[in-house]
């Protein structure tokens, strides 16, 4: 199956409505990952088909969980997941990509320019040291244990905001270790077409 068809079929299977223009931009992002991977060590994946599944479709499972938000922070963004695919599909949301690895943030800056993402800002630094970002939703994909994630990023969450942590298997133990002042709003299993692995999203808020 041609890559454009594979992406379109995956998006349709997920019940998402994403324009042709946005889909083309998502594939341009995959091209950038492939182009700069050796220089910046962005992903262990080399196969384009797997990149579409793991980096695009997996990231797009976040979209239904950021309806109505105006600002989002992607912590430990790495090569830009889930932040860049989200930014492509939601140009109305101001998104900050944060990573401590300067090689990764150099790539992110390049990607933002080449993809024309006017709604994205890239910040280089450790999350605990960042103080000039406030977001309606703070997200991450495979970044840290939930308790550490909320502890390190609580000061970056707007009043009334929430965390959206993208995880693999159901994180029962991690949920049990969350601090008392954090409320688990929802844990939802995510279905990623073509991915033979468990995925969950954990929505958390301050009590």
UniProtKB/Swiss-Prot annotation:
- Catalytic activity, as annotated: guanosine(527) in 16S rRNA + S-adenosyl-L-methionine = N(7)-methylguanosine(527) in 16S rRNA + S-adenosyl-L-homocysteine
Please report the name of this protein according to its UniProt entry: Ribosomal RNA small subunit methyltransferase G
Please give the function described in this protein's UniProt entry: Specifically methylates the N7 position of guanine in position 527 of 16S rRNA.
Query: Which UniProt keywords are present, listed alphabetically?
Result: Cytoplasm, Methyltransferase, rRNA processing, S-adenosyl-L-methionine, Transferase
GO molecular function terms noted in the UniProt entry? rRNA (guanine-N7-)-methyltransferase activity
EC assignment = 2.1.1.170
Query: GO cellular-component terms in the record?
Result: cytosol
Subcellular localization(s) per the UniProt record: Cytoplasm
Family per similarity comment: Belongs to the methyltransferase superfamily. RNA methyltransferase RsmG family.
| Chain sites annotated for binding S-adenosyl-L-methionine | 76, 81, 127-128, 141
Q: Major location, coarse class?
A: cytoplasm
Extract the CDD domains matched here.
AdoMet_MTases
HAMAP family attached to this UniProt entry: 16SrRNA_methyltr_G (MF_00074)
* Organism of origin: Neisseria meningitidis serogroup C / serotype 2a (strain ATCC 700532 / DSM 15464 / FAM18)
């Amino acid at each position: 199956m041609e890559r454009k068809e594979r992406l379109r079929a995956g998006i349709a299977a997920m019940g998402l409505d994403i324009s042709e223009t946005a889909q083309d931009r998502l594939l341009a992002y995959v091209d950038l990952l492939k182009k700069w991977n050796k220089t910046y060590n962005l992903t262990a994946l080399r196969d384009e088909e797997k990149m579409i599944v793991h980096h695009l479709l997996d990231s797009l499972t976040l979209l239904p969980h950021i309806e109505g938000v105006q600002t989002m922070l992607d912590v430990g963004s790495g090569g830009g997941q889930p932040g860049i695919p989200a930014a492509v599909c939601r140009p109305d949301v101001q998104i900050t990509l944060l990573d401590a690895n300067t090689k990764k943030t150099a790539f992110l800056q390049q990607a933002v320019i080449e993809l024309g993402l006017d709604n994205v800002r890239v910040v280089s630094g450790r999350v605990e040291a960042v103080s000039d970002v406030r977001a309606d939703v703070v997200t991450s994909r495979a970044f840290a244990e939930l308790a550490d994630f909320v502890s390190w990023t609580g000061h970056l969450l707007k009043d009334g905001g929430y965390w959206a942590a993208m995880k693999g298997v159901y994180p029962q133990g991690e949920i049990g270790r969350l601090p008392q002042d954090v409320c688990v709003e929802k844990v939802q299993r995510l279905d990623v077409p073509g991915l033979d692995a468990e995925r969950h999203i954990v929505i958390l808020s301050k009590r």
